[in-house]
Design a protein with these regions (language model features):
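Gly/Ser/Thr-rich phosphate-binding loop
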Residues: 21, 47-50, 73-78, 87-150, ...
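Glycine-centered tight turns that cap/initiate beta-strands
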Residues: 101, 161, 259-262, 307, ...
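Short hydrophobic/charged patches on amphipathic alpha-helices used for structural packing
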Residues: 61-65, 94, 206, 251-252
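Beta-strand->loop->alpha-helix junctions that form or flank phosphate-binding loops
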Residues: 129-136, 155-158, 266-269, 315
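Conserved ATP/PPi-binding loop(s) of AMP-dependent carboxylate-activating enzymes
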Residues: 157-161, 172-207, 245, 340-341
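Active-site glycine-centered loops adjacent to acidic/histidine catalytic or metal-binding residues
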Residues: 109, 133, 156, 218, ...
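AMP-binding/adenylate-forming catalytic core of the ANL superfamily
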Residues: 69, 76, 191, 196-197, ...
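Conserved AMP-binding/adenylation subdomain of ANL enzymes
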Residues: 5-28, 32-75, 88-89
Length: 353
């Protein structure tokens, strides 16, 4: 549950995280039924008095590219899934189009792989700026803001006025961890768009706050320059042979292989290692599943990550299960792999094939 006072933070973060100014031609590709589509597709642009582009059709690469030039889009807010679909089409697909009016591009919904940041610089002459927030926070908390140096793979630094930390929880107490340490990503409460409750779930709401911190459920680390790096959801971590592995790290390495378009990674039980890493991948055009390609992708992953972290198994899929916001549903992959109940699938937008 959120309150109308949240509009204050939508106005502030729209201006300082997305560079929205009066008259800016702005396109947020998120569906208005998703929190990004509400907060930054409707409220933030309205209160910042921008010109909004609204496109209700499904993703179409040529229409998207053409719209940027035709409508003279200046600020573009999209999602990693769409960016990966653009990458899949190749640099050549963008060549006929004009992106000269673009001055700022941002991404949200799930972590943006480093490869996507590098690719966007080649195609658009500037990087997509990743940022991080949740439905619970109501607005952007950590961002690669305009004018900041972008570190590919990092979600940036806390917004002005937001106190973020990497913490370790011990019962009812919390201690902050130093730079380079993986822990719970936590925030000091108090910003206007913060949730006020989970509807009819008071116990769940209270559990989210410990010792003066909101515990996000995401694991991350902070580097020596104050940039935050996403590691994974606490319940997605894979424990194998004494290593604690975040799926995002493995997925990012996999999509650096020229054949791989998208990847979803899970841990499956193993008598010796505890868990082993299994990857589900979709392929770019011009590549077909084969044993030779699987070996090549596994070899690439071992070089990038080391044998302890690289996937032991790779499964080819045409599509991966995703939510409406474009997040790959790893828990669904794992439930199906292990024959477990699938749980709530109300947010499932596209299933695996």
């Amino acid at each position: 549950m959120h309150v109308h006072n949240a509009v204050l933070y939508h106005a502030f973060s729209g201006r300082h995280a997305l560079d929205l100014r009066p008259g800016t031609v702005y396109w947020c590709t998120a569906d208005p039924g998703w929190v990004t589509g509400t907060s930054y597709g409707i409220i933030a642009p309205l209160v910042n008095r921008v010109t909004m582009i609204v496109d209700e059709a499904e993703f179409d690469l040529d229409r998207w590219y053409g719209m940027i030039g035709r409508e003279k889009v200046e600020v573009w807010y999209s999602a990693p899934t769409a960016i990966r679909m653009m990458m899949r089409a190749g640099v050549e697909a963008a060549a006929p189009y004009d992106f000269a009016t673009l001055r700022f591009m941002a991404s949200v919904g799930e972590p943006l792989n480093p490869e996507a940041v590098v690719w966007s610089e080649k195609v658009f002459g500037q990087p997509f700026h990743d940022n991080w927030w949740q439905t619970e926070t109501g607005g952007i908390m950590i961002a690669n803001r305009p004018g900041m140096a972008v570190k590919p793979g990092s979600m940036g630094q806390p917004m002005p006025g937001i106190v973020a930390g990497i913490v370790e929880r011990d019962g009812d107490s919390v201690s902050e961890l130093g730079t380079g340490k993986v822990g719970d990503l936590a925030l000091r409460p108090g910003w206007p768009s913060m949730m006020r409750a989970y509807l009819h779930e008071e116990a769940r709401y209270r559990k989210a706050f410990v010792d003066g911190w909101y515990i996000s459920g995401d694991l991350a680390l902070r580097d020596e320059e104050g940039y935050f790096w996403f590691v994974g959801r606490a319940d997605d971590l894979i424990k194998t042979s004494g290593h604690l592995i975040g799926p995002f790290e493995v997925e990012s390495a996999l999509i650096e292989h020229p054949a791989v378009a998208e990847a979803g990674v899970i841990g499956i039980p193993d008598d010796t290692a505890g868990e082993i890493v299994k990857a589900y991948v979709t392929l770019n055009p011009g590549h077909d599943p084969s044993e030779a390609l699987e070996r090549d992708i596994r070899g690439h992953a071992r070089k990038k990550l080391g044998p302890a972290v690289a996937p032991r198994e790779i499964v080819f899929r045409n599509t991966l299960p995703k939510t409406r916001s474009g997040k790959i549903m790893r828990r669904l992959l794992k439930a199906r792999e292990l024959g477990l109940p699938e749980g709530d699938t109300s947010t499932l937008e596209s299933d695996e094939t």
